[in-house]
Curated annotation (Swiss-Prot):
The gene is plsY. Keywords: Cell inner membrane, Cell membrane, Lipid biosynthesis, Lipid metabolism, Membrane, Phospholipid biosynthesis, Phospholipid metabolism, Transferase, Transmembrane, Transmembrane helix. It comes from Gluconobacter oxydans (strain 621H). It is a multi-pass membrane protein. PANTHER family: GLYCEROL-3-PHOSPHATE ACYLTRANSFERASE-RELATED, INNER MEMBRANE PROTEIN YGIH. This is Glycerol-3-phosphate acyltransferase. SMART domains: G3P_acyltransf (SM01207). The lineage of its organism: Bacteria, Pseudomonadati, Pseudomonadota, Alphaproteobacteria, Acetobacterales. It is an enzyme of class 2 (transferase). The chain crosses the membrane at residues 8-28, 56-76, 87-107, 119-139, 144-164, 165-185. Its EC number is 2.3.1.275. Probably interacts with PlsX.
């Protein structure tokens, strides 16, 4: 094993651990909201935290989940020996895997949307901005958060190629594609409900009044 390969393994582990911090679970518990895994969909992400009726708590979860994605890529970019697009791509994928499959929760985590967006903001901020706009616009119009997330990550790989000028086969577009595929896979049950018209809508206005 080469030194660079060993560094990539270490970076993957560091990024995975960062991603596996379950902010939704921790914040809800500290705020006296109980175990978020026993509320709503049982997911630890911001959308399910919003179902507790605590809009500020959901916003904090969204922000912190995004920041851990950004942090992993920033570590790979500025603090890791031999920093390159490859190290940034590895960190981006590993931190999203950590969020989706945290060892502390029996590998049952979130769906990776906020963390994925956090990585993309650092990899190429115009793509991150475009994905956020798509997500928020579709979610606002449909009142279905999963629809916004799926739309954003359907477009993310193509946007990365177009806006960053990188060929599809290079590390950062490949990482964006892998993250998008993982997020779509994590939304398989949502997709099934969207097809049948049974996907629940997020009652943002009701939540904001609590």
């Amino acid at each position: 094993m080469s030194g660079f390969q060993a560094q990539l393994i270490l970076l993957s582990l560091v990024s995975y651990v960062i991603g596996s911090i379950p902010f939704g679970l921790l914040l809800t518990a500290v705020a006296g909201g109980g175990d978020i895994r026993k509320i709503g969909s049982g997911n630890i992400g911001a959308t399910n935290v919003l179902r507790t009726g605590r809009r500020g708590l959901a916003a904090a979860t969204l922000l912190l989940d995004a920041l851990k994605g950004a942090l992993a890529v920033l570590i790979a970019r500025f603090f890791f020996p031999g920093a390159s697009e490859t190290t940034m791509a590895v960190a981006a994928v590993a931190v999203v895997i950590g969020h989706c499959f945290p060892v502390w929760l029996g590998f049952r985590g979130g769906k990776g949307v906020a963390t994925g967006l956090g990585t993309i903001w650092v990899l190429c901020w115009p793509v991150g901005l475009a994905c956020c706009v798509v997500w928020l616009l579709v979610a606002r119009l449909s009142r279905i958060s999963s629809a916004g997330a799926l739309a954003a990550f359907l477009l993310a790989p193509g946007l990365m190629v177009l806006l960053s000028g990188r060929p599809l086969h290079t590390p950062i577009p490949v990482a964006t594609l892998l993250i998008s595929l993982l997020i779509w896979a994590r939304h398989s049950s949502n997709i099934a409900r969207l097809v049948t018209g049974r996907e629940p809508r997020v009652k943002v206005d009701q939540a904001s009044r609590r």
